[in-house]
Curated annotation (Swiss-Prot):
Record protein name field: Ribonuclease P protein component
HAMAP family per record: RNase_P (MF_00227)
Record lineage: Bacteria, Pseudomonadati, Pseudomonadota, Gammaproteobacteria, Aeromonadales
UniProt cross-references to InterPro entries, sorted A to Z: Ribosomal_Su5_D2-typ_SF (IPR020568), Ribsml_uS5_D2-typ_fold_subgr (IPR014721), RNase_P (IPR000100), RNase_P_CS (IPR020539)
Organism: Aeromonas salmonicida (strain A449)
Coiled-coil ranges (or none): none
Enzyme class: hydrolase
């Protein structure tokens, strides 16, 4: 497993097949601004994929900010997550949130997802 608190290539969902697997039978944790989908993986660590559509967040600056905050939150919380593949889907309401609010919301969603995936 990679050292704690990194976000290396092996911690990312990279191919369309990885994303399709998560979308096929997901465990959900959602808020009006963000949805997290997850499914178990055969690895010993969680992996993250991001879906931040232009339709929800028109400006690249907004999309990049959301991705940056999600990656940082995942990086700091990955040790407490089970071996699951996670796809984060941003919705339009996320652009009104500041970084601190988004970070707190993500921590709550990580805990919810962890509980649902562990039984």
């Amino acid at each position: 497993m990679p050292t704690p608190h990194t976000f290396s290539r092996e911690l990312r969902l990279l191919t369309p097949e990885h994303f399709k697997r998560v979308f096929a039978e997901p465990v959900r944790a959602a808020s009006p601004q963000i949805t997290l989908l997850a499914c178990p993986n055969t690895l010993e660590h969680p992996r993250l994929g991001l879906a931040v559509p232009k339709k929800a967040l028109k400006r690249a600056v907004w999309r990049n900010r959301v991705k940056r905050v999600v990656r940082e939150s995942f990086r700091l919380n990955q040790a407490s997550l089970p071996a699951i593949d996670i796809v984060v889907i941003a919705k339009g309401g996320v652009k009104e949130m500041d970084n601190e609010e988004l970070f707190k919301l993500l921590e709550k969603l990580w805990r919810t997802l962890s509980r649902r995936c562990n039984g």
